Amino acid sequence: MDRRNFIKNTGWSFLGLAASGSLLGSCAAGSKEAKKKMPSASDLKMYWGDLHNHCNITYGHGDMRDAFEAAKGQLDFVSVTPHAMWPDIPGADDPRLKWVIDYHTGAFKRLREGGYEKYVAMTNEYNKEGEFLTFVGYEAHSMEHGDHVALNYDLDAPLVECTSIEDWKQKAKGHKVFITPHHMGYQGGYRGYNWKCFTEGDQTPFVEMYSRHGLAESDQGDYPYLHDMGPRQWEGTIQYGLELGNKFGIMASTDQHSGYPGSYGDGRIGVLAPSLTRDAIWEALRTRHVCAATGDKILIDFRLNDAFMGDVVRGNSRRIYLNVTGESCIDYVDIVKNGQILARMNGPLTPVAPEGDTVRCKVKVDFGWNREEQYVHWQGKLSVDKGRILSVTPCFRGAAFTSPQEGETEFHTHVNRIVSADEKETELDMYSSKNPNTTTAAMQAVILEVEMPKDGKVIADFNGKKFEHTLGELLEGSRSHFMIGWLSEAILFNRAMPESCFTVEHYMEDKEPQRDTDYYYVRVRQRDGQWAWRSEEHTS
């Protein structure tokens, strides 16, 4: 499809340098047109994980085994992370903070009295090379330097004691360990990140930009910090660090405290690697071939000249190739250069239904909206009567805890599962809880990628109730159903998303260097509020 017809037929529009670029069309990555422009990345695949999350092994909720089971259900790799130390813990003379000190130091003591050995043993138990990878890691808090997580290559890595984050980094030299700062936007001196302590290189190849705490891309925009640790400010953010000239990858993880790694919407890391092996994933992490996503597994193929994400390239002329495949309608795609929008590609306000009878679409089905506090157990199947299901992507959430609070009681993690899936149906076993407020979701969901005729039906058969809609109906808009009646749990068939609204491929050139070293990164926003960011590339 040529540029004029693509814009006319799909509702996309382009601003900045993108307006003068070469639109390759709405298509799968690696089209014939793209291959003429840029090298293929067909030998690499995006793998998804969570490298920072918590359960009741220290302070948090949910059993550790359930945490690994939950991770297996929707991730490729994980590190379930105990809290290990806080060398500069404050408040020794402040009665107001006594419970905080006791709570933390008690957990550190339990970890050293057998908890760490139990954790390492279970991490080894769940590690399956080529299927599901696990990593040993642990967290250290710091008022001065900000909180960090150590991620180890070795599955028998010891717990290393330290007197500060800088001492920790010194002791880790020569070992295969990444030390990664997180929730970076808090105030300096109060567990926000101190960029004066950043050391570029293999020990800290990436930083955690997004989690349940919020988004530290800048001091503006979506996902402000709302935790009682304080507001988000400028000096700890990613853009502040980039403006200092630092080079690092950007990633996300949940920092979840209810034993549900990968909890949908709380943060995930994507790693571009040739295989799901420890060596391949570790090397991709080391070389900054990483991306960040809030929840949806949005694929971003962004290259400058022949370089991939996280790389450093040289040259005044930069050939930019971009291919994005979302899980829902794309709101916009930004190419950011030196903190400013170089180009923006706007997706359609309303997806345009494709011509023809048989179409490829993505249909998300949500389950939840409980009236009562008790969990609703969803058991049943989603199916199609015509065409086929190409893939089933889980969007499973854990309980909405960012951190434990005084007086909270323990609870059992309810692990959601895709029991089976084939081209005609998928069997699901899920638990939804009441949305804790009108801005925090607790529903469970899956995304069906389908190829089927418009008169084919998408059918939900759960808990003795059956609802169905044709794909043609869902292309017109979403449909919802209460299970019992008003003020009861509900099912939502979201609007069917045609390929033209969640996929775009683009090529352009930037011939204007601005600095000795320019940095670029890509960010993608979907209309449902899901985000993804591709690690920056630097050009000298």
Which role fits each region the language model picked out?
Residues N5-S26:
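N-terminal export signals
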Residues W12-F14, C27, E33-S540:
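Extended, charged catalytic domains and RNA/DNA-binding interfaces, predominantly
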